[in-house]
Amino acid sequence: MSELNTAHPVSYFNLHAEGCGYLNRVRIVQPEKGSPYVACTIAAKHGDTANPSTTKFDCRVSGVRAQAIVQQLEAAVNAEKRVFIGFRIGDFMPELFVYQNGVRKGETGVVNNGRLLQVTFAKVDGQAFELPPEEGVAAEATATLPL
């Protein structure tokens, strides 16, 4: 009987995508139930560099360092500057939706939802953006946690 109550370690398979693309629509999402969170859209580039294709990811920003970086870049995104980032996204899944307005009104579209785990580099209008050091962000996050 005691064997049934023995704790077994839980393990997971992780699915991550790494790439680069343009950061858009940085926002705070306030769900009806639950805590607010930072979200963004990434227009990921892939294929031939002369004529790349784009895949959009709608992300909840999950990594502590990623949250700090995205919030620092929010002003540049809102000023319609071109913010190009390197990223790692996890737990992404496609989701269908119906366009509510515009030329594609009534058509079915697909959005890839995921969690933005890491920002590896950033450029604003082609200029390198200095990312905060990893240990500094983790220390700040720990210092601001309620006791």
Where are these regions (language model features)?
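Single-stranded nucleic acid-binding surfaces, predominantly the OB-fold ssDNA-binding core
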Residues: M1-L147
